[in-house]
A protein has these predicted regions:
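Post-His helix in hydrolase/transferase enzymes
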Residues: 143-156
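Acidic beta-to-alpha connecting loop that harbors the catalytic carboxylate
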Residues: 10, 110-112, 136-139
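A conserved short beta-strand
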Residues: 76-89
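Short beta-strand/loop motif that positions the catalytic acidic residue
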Residues: 100, 106-108, 112
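Catalytic histidine neighborhood in serine/cysteine hydrolases
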Residues: 28, 125-142
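Gly/Ala-rich beta-loop-alpha elbow adjacent to hydrolase catalytic centers
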Residues: 58-67
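Conserved alpha/beta-hydrolase "acid-adjacent" motif
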Residues: 15, 113-119, 143
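Active-site catalytic motif of lipid deacylating hydrolases and related acyltransferases
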Residues: 2-52
Length: 156
């Protein structure tokens, strides 16, 4: 059985728009509030998923960076990643020496000025060997695109 988790962005929380949407439409999606820097948040995520396998990590912005870093460290524990405007342009992130094979859907907004596709996509292509890319007519928040994604299939 798979476990789906939502990883919120840096300045967001489980009270953010996407988290509230998941609670309303897909209450099985697990989430928690992450605090601190990237390494602290990754420790919190590791504690949260201790003993779990077949993880479906849905990461928004900084949460997408968290999901990517977790998958690089534990690819065998990840079933799928859904990266929503991930912060792969964050200065500390470096793609791994060898691409990981976790199936990954990368969704970006064409008008995103926080995590612009021209900076994020090359990082994703250097990280994942099984990458599907969608560039939507949207901005960083992906408010128009997010609710109409194929969540019933992405979360199984």
């Amino acid at each position: 059985m798979s476990t789906a988790l939502f990883l919120h962005g840096l300045d967001s929380s489980t009270q953010g728009t996407k988290a509230r949407w998941f609670r309303q439409h897909f209450p099985q999606v697990q989430m928690r509030d992450y605090v601190g820097d990237l390494s602290q948040r990754l420790v919190q995520l590791e504690e949260q998923v201790q003993g779990l396998e077949k993880l479906i990590l849905v990461g928004s912005s900084f949460g997408g960076l968290m999901a990517t870093c977790f998958a690089i460290r534990y690819p065998e524990r990840c079933k799928r990643l859904v990266l929503l405007a991930p912060a792969l342009n964050f200065g500390e992130f470096q793609p791994p020496l060898e691409k990981i094979t976790v199936p990954t859907l990368l969704i970006m907004g064409r008008h995103d000025t926080v995590c612009p596709p021209h900076l994020v996509q090359p990082q994703a292509e250097a990280t994942f060997s099984h990458l599907q890319v969608r560039i939507e007519d949207d901005d960083h928040m992906l408010h128009a695109s997010f609710p109409v994604l194929d969540w019933p299939n992405l979360l199984i």
